[in-house]
C-alpha cells in the first residue's frame, strides 16, 4: 500500500501519538507498519499476515513452528537458521523436543529466541538448549539489537562471511507478534539497523542467508523452490 501522511500539523501529531502508543516508528506516516501494530494491539483476526515493511517482505503471526525438513519452503514460512550437511547447526527446539542441542560455534554461545511453557517469548545467549530449561520452541541465530556482537558468538574470521551484503532472514518479536523478515541485499549491520530503528523489534536473531534466504507468504514468494533443511513456519 502507499503510505499516507496527515495534511495538517495536528493530523501528523495525532498519527505520531498513535504510532508511539502501539510501538511503531513515529514518523507521521500511516503504512503497513503502523496498521499491523494497531491490528496486533486490537487483537485483529488477520494473522499470519504477509506485508512489506519498509520495503522488506515480512510475515507476522502469533506463533511459529520451527521445522527441520528437506525440501521446498512450506507456506507462510521463511528459511531458518544455520545448517550444515543437511542438519541444523544452531540451537533448535520444536514442540518441546530438542532437535539441535548445541550452538553454531560451540563452546561459544549464540542468541536464541525461545517460547516458555507459559507463553512468554524471550531471548538468551547460551551454548546449549539445556540452559534454556523447559521450552516450547527455540531458534538460535546471530543476536541483533542490544545483543549484536558477532565475534562473541563466533562469527569472526572464516565465519564472518555470514555478515556480508546478501539476502538474509530474521526472526524477531514485538508486542506479542513474531516477525519473519526477508532482508534484501543487506549487510548484518544494515539488518540490525532495520530491526532496531525502523521495525522497533524487542528481540531478534538473524538466521541463515545468501542462496538459501527465502520467504513463502501469501504475496511474497522469493526463492521458494530452493531445498531447505530448516524453516520457520508462521501460525
Stretch-by-stretch model annotation:
Residues 77-80, 204-208:
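Active-site neighborhood of phospho(di)ester-bond hydrolases with catalytic His/Asp-centered motifs
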Residues 59-60, 76-78, 113, 121-123, ...:
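Short hydrophobic-aromatic micro-motifs
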Residues 53, 118-121, 173-179:
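Beta-strand-turn-beta hairpins that frame and shape the catalytic cleft
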Residues 86-155:
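Active-site-adjacent helix-turn-beta-strand microarchitecture at beta-sheet edges
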Residues 88-107, 161-173, 177-206, 212-235:
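Conserved, well-ordered active-site substructure
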Residues 50, 112, 170:
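Short, surface-exposed charged micro-motifs
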Residues 39-106, 180-181:
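Zymogen propeptides
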Residues 1-16, 20-42:
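Short acidic, glycine/serine/threonine-rich helix-capping segments at coil-helix boundaries
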Amino acid at each position: 500500500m502507499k503510505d499516507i501522511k496527515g495534511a495538517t500539523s495536528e493530523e501528523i501529531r495525532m498519527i505520531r501519538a498513535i504510532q508511539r502508543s502501539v510501538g511503531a516508528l513515529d514518523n507521521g506516516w500511516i503504512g503497513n507498519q503502523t496498521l499491523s501494530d494497531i491490528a496486533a494491539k486490537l487483537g485483529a483476526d488477520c494473522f499470519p499476515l504477509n506485508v512489506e515493511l519498509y520495503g522488506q517482505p515480512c510475515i507476522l503471526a502469533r506463533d511459529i513452528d520451527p521445522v527441520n525438513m528437506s525440501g521446498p519452503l512450506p507456506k507462510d514460512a521463511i528459511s531458518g537458521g544455520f545448517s550444515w550437511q543437511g542438519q541444523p547447526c544452531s540451537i533448535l527446539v520444536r514442540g518441546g523436543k530438542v532437535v539441535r542441542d548445541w550452538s553454531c560455534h560451540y563452546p561459544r554461545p549464540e542468541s536464541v529466541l525461545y517460547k516458555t511453557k507459559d507463553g512468554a517469548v524471550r531471548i538468551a545467549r547460551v551454548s546449549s538448549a539445556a540452559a534454556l530449561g523447559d521450552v516450547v520452541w527455540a531458534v538460535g541465530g546471530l543476536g541483533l539489537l542490544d545483543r549484536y556482537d558477532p565475534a562473541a558468538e563466533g562469527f569472526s574470521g572464516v565465519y564472518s562471511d555470514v555478515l556480508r551484503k546478501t539476502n538474509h532472514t530474521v526472526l524477531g518479536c514485538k508486542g506479542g507478534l513474531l516477525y519473519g523478515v526477508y532482508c534484501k541485499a543487506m549487510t548484518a549491520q544494515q539488518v540490525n539497523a532495520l530491526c532496531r530503528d525502523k521495525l522497533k523489534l524487542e528481540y531478534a536473531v538473524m538466521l541463515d542467508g545468501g542462496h538459501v534466504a527465502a520467504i513463502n507468504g501469501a504475496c511474497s514468494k522469493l526463492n521458494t523452490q530452493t531445498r531447505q533443511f530448516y524453516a520457520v513456519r508462521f501460525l
